[in-house]
Swiss-Prot record:
One of its GO terms (biological process) is cristae formation. Disulfide bonds: none annotated. It comes from Blastomyces gilchristii (strain SLH14081). It is a single-pass membrane protein. Its main location: mitochondrion. Keywords: Coiled coil, Membrane, Mitochondrion, Mitochondrion inner membrane, Transit peptide, Transmembrane, Transmembrane helix. The keyword Membrane applies. InterPro entries: MIC60. This is MICOS complex subunit MIC60. Residues 360-505 form a coiled coil. Residues 131-141 have a biased composition (Pro residues).
Length: 689
């Protein structure tokens, strides 16, 4: 016997009816687990005790039937669904709630549940399921420090690169960037140097190729602290004349000696300026030994009051030659040589000029190298300028050729468009002219017919007038002649009536004949100009209506098959094209006997591939000869003989060409009927004449 566990039902009944809203979701999950446990069923070994007997071993035996009944009701009741209106949806748990399923107190179990269900029952009480493990704590939110650092680095790099780029465009921003941003000036200078090297690669290569020679400093020269130029103009103080010092007022020989020394120095300066420019190798070498300016000895005069002047112990310094370069045509080199020569002049005027001879020589060499380098840079610049001029000239020639080609293309395109417009206009004019000519011809034809009718009417009126005049004359004559010529007058009247009726019949016959001819021409034009089989019922009905009283025309129309004028007939070109397709199939079946099978068909198909096609006008009754003769006749336009040749085929060949023969017969029938109708129309014209 199946029954529900009492312990499970007690767990269900132990849950509160109205749970706390804050922990409602916990009770809902627990209720689901309890319902799942309650749905389990067990087999009972012993019989169920009577409801009225109270067990002495259970202290709460009176409540046992009620609990079992409630458990039965709870198990038999359908579990609440999600759409049940009596069941409230669980409230969302608050984030601040710290309740856990394991912290909720369980109701105490009754002693009846702890022991057996009855004294004689051997069923063990159901074991309680272990409580579910506590949920995992929510993972800590990621701080994203590495991502922020990466974004900060990228943003800083982009801002720095943008600042460097904008510094190359704006001078104000350049000052701000290089002053307040670290390493800003180095970055901007590096980019400017790269830009300069990309613009002038030849100058950059020459700068890289230059070998810096070690500089010879020479001996150290000590310069006094207050020597050289100063920003403040020194005030020259005129010293008071000292009569105790040596001078002209004491000795006249010293003044003469000083005058001679001054003249020698000025003469040396003029000699240096008048000398030609020395070569580079000679300018680097030290010059010859300096000339010692010896003062002219003064006259030996015995002077008892003053001593004779002494000879100079140290010889005078040699004058340093000025710098001379071959490329003095450059303004920069000229200024540099001029400044350097002024410096040499100043040094030469000093007594210690010999100390500066070696540095001056080295400076000359460096200046010569600088001059050569300037010339080389100028030559390179000229070569690069020439190369750019040649490239510009080539680009100009290329663009000119491209422009000429484009102009030629545009001209050719315009000519083609003009030609197309001319052709279209010519076609329009030709078409309009043809329409105009057709209209004029139609109008002329109508005018001619109307004129003919008018002439006939005038003739009839004139005849009637003559007739009346004749009648009047005859009547008068009869009156005068007492009706002697009454019989002759009656005969003349009858003749005139007959002639008038005859002329009317002639006109009607001519009109009908012309209309019949036009209708026949319309049928023939429709058949000849149609590219596909086209019905010609209306044209044939017009012919039949115009020749309704002509038995010959009616018989010719009746001889035409209804299929021919209802569906149309193929043109000669279509017949020839279809014959070629039919001929290929007939050749495949040309070797088949009358009662041929699949093998015979296959053999005939294979052998037809190797058969030679005949040319010319072959003689014979074989299939190939008949097909060749038929094709020649079709090319000549003789469809009647071609149909006769194809009709002479036998067996499968004739069966395959049956449809083509039917089309040819219909074409020949229509052609023959049209010829008969045209002949009849001509015959009627001859009869009228």
């Amino acid at each position: 016997m199946l029954r529900t566990s009492i312990a499970s039902s007690r767990q269900v009944l132990s849950s509160p009816i109205c749970p706390n809203p804050s922990v409602q979701w916990l009770h809902t999950s627990r209720a689901r687990r309890v319902n799942a446990a309650a749905s389990r069923r067990y087999y009972a070994v012993a019989r169920k005790p009577n409801a009225g007997v109270r067990s002495s071993s259970t202290p709460n035996a009176a409540a046992t039937p009620e609990l079992s009944q409630k458990a039965t009701n709870s198990t038999s009741t359908k579990p609440p669904g999600p759409n049940d209106p009596d069941v409230r949806s669980p409230a969302s748990p608050s984030t601040g709630s710290t309740l856990h399923p394991e912290t909720v107190s369980k109701p105490p179990q009754s002693p009846a549940v702890q022991g057996q269900t009855s004294p004689g029952s051997s069923v063990q009480p159901p074991e309680h399921e272990p409580s579910p493990p506590p949920p995992r704590p929510p993972p800590a939110p990621k701080t994203g420090l590495l991502r922020k650092l990466l974004y900060l680095f990228l943003t800083t790099g982009l801002a720095y690169a943008g600042g460097v780029w904008y510094s190359l465009r704006s001078d104000n921003f350049y000052d701000f960037f290089t002053e307040y941003i670290p390493y800003g000036e180095e970055a901007v200078l590096y980019l400017e140097e790269r830009d300069f090297r990309s613009r002038f690669p030849s100058i950059a290569r020459q700068i890289n190729r230059r070998v810096s020679a070690p500089r010879d400093e020479g001996a150290q020269v000590m310069i006094p602290g207050r020597s050289g130029l100063s920003w403040k103009v020194a005030e020259e103080q005129q010293e008071a004349s000292d009569v105790t010092k040596q001078g002209q007022h004491i000795s006249a020989t010293d003044a003469n000696e000083l005058t001679e020394e001054t003249k020698v120095a000025e003469k040396a300066k003029e000699d240096v300026k008048s000398k030609p420019v020395a070569k580079k190798a000679e300018a680097a070498e030290p010059k010859s030994s300096p000339k010692v300016v010896e003062p002219h000895p003064a006259k030996a005069e015995e002077n008892t009051s003053l001593e004779a002047p002494r000879q100079p112990v140290v010889p005078a310094a040699a004058a340093i030659e000025h710098l001379g370069l071959d490329n003095e045509d450059e303004p920069v080199v000229q200024d540099l040589v001029k400044v350097f020569n002024d410096i040499i002049t100043v040094i030469s005027a000093d007594e210690s000029a010999s100390k500066f001879s070696v540095p001056i020589a080295k400076a000359k060499e460096e200046l010569e190298k600088i001059g050569d380098r300037i010339v080389a840079l100028k030559n390179d610049a000229q070569e690069s300028a020439k190369e750019e001029i040649r490239n510009a000239q080539a680009a100009l020639d290329k663009s000119a050729a491209e422009l000429v080609r484009h102009i030629n293309e545009v001209r050719a395109q315009d000519a083609a468009e003009f030609r197309e417009e001319f052709e279209s206009e010519r076609e329009k004019i030709s078409k309009s002219y043809q329409e105009k000519v057709t209209t004029e011809l139609q109008r002329a034809h109508e005018v001619a017919e109307q004129r003919l009718r008018n002439e006939l009417v005038e003739q009839a009126i004139e005849l009637n007038r003559k007739f009346l005049a004749d009648v009047k004359t005859l009547v008068e004559n009869e009156r005068e002649g007492r009706l002697s010529k009454l019989a002759e007058l009656t005969a003349n009247v009858a003749e005139l009536e007959r002639l008038t009726a005859g002329w009317s019949d002639v006109i009607d016959i001519n009109l009908r004949t012309q209309q019949l001819q036009v209708a026949v021409d319309s049928v023939r034009t429709t058949l000849e100009n149609s590219e596909v089989p086209r019905p010609f019922i209306r044209e044939l009905a017009a012919v039949k209506e115009l020749a309704s009283n002509d038995e010959v025309v009616a018989a010719a129309i009746a001889s035409i098959s209804p299929t021919a004028y209802q569906r149309g007939i193929p043109s000669p070109a279509q017949l020839v094209d279809r014959f070629r397709r039919v001929a290929s199939e007939v050749r495949k079946a040309s070797l088949l006997p009358e009662n041929a099978g699949i093998t015979s068909h296959a053999a005939s198909l294979v052998l037809s591939k190797v058969m030679l096609k005949k040319q010319g006008t072959p003689v014979g009754n074989d299939v190939e000869s008949i097909l060749t003769r038929t094709e020649n006749l079709l090319e000549e336009g003789n469809f009647d003989e071609a149909a006769r040749e194809m009709n002479s085929l036998q067996g499968w060949a004739k069966l395959l060409s049956k449809d083509w023969l039917a089309d040819v017969r219909r074409v020949l029938e229509v052609k023959q009927a049209l010829e008969v109708i045209e002949t009849e129309a001509r015959l009627r014209c001859l009869q009228v004449e």
